Amino acid sequence: MVDAILTAVCVLRVHWWRVIHAFEIRSEALRAVTVRHTAIRRAVDSFLSLSIAVKLFSRDETFFDHFRQLAEYIGSSAVLLKQLLEHPADAARIAAEIKKVETDGDAIVYLINQRIDTSFVTPLDREDIHLLAKRLDNVIDIINGAARRVVMFRVIVSRAGGVRMADVIVRASREILESVADVTKPKRMAEHSRAIKVMEEEGDALYAECVGALFAHDEPAIEVLKWKEIFDALEQAIDECDDVSNVLESIALKNS
């Protein structure tokens, strides 16, 4: 009887140790799986953290695309303004095209302001981005204002002086487009700035010549009033091109 009991106890002990051993093996496997899963989870967390950091701290370069688009709008509206002054009989249609460009420009400025608010890191100082966008948009607004005056005043005869001033704006707009592409190159920007400054002085001389001619001849008072306002707007557009150039040159020097 005792022998039977001892035998049973021995058998139970063997089974018990087998169970314990199997459990330990399983536990080791579970621990290995847990460690592996933990490592994977940490790797994923690290990757996500890095992705977020890259997104947060990477510079948003789309601002330069927006600046280039605004510069192109200046160019297209300037060309249209020159056509309008050459053919005032078609002023209403051309002015409508300029107005569309002006509206598109406002939409770009809105996008720029939104990006300033949502970008963690900007390629330029936020104040410079805002100022440059404002200056570029101002040129388009002034060109639109000049076109609107030609329509409002029922101008039917072209004046060579007005066309020549518009041509200065066209040439300055081309220089602005090149300036935007070279905004981080101080030496190139200095060249663009000098070129636009020469155009601005040419515009001032043309303005004085055109306004002087209005009062030098026996012009009807209503024509003097009309064209004085138009010449004022054209000269303002040329001056604003120079202001854009000054902002671009300042940005180039800051970021050289």
Regions found by a protein language model. Give the residues of each.
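Tryptophan (W) side chains
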Residues: 16-17
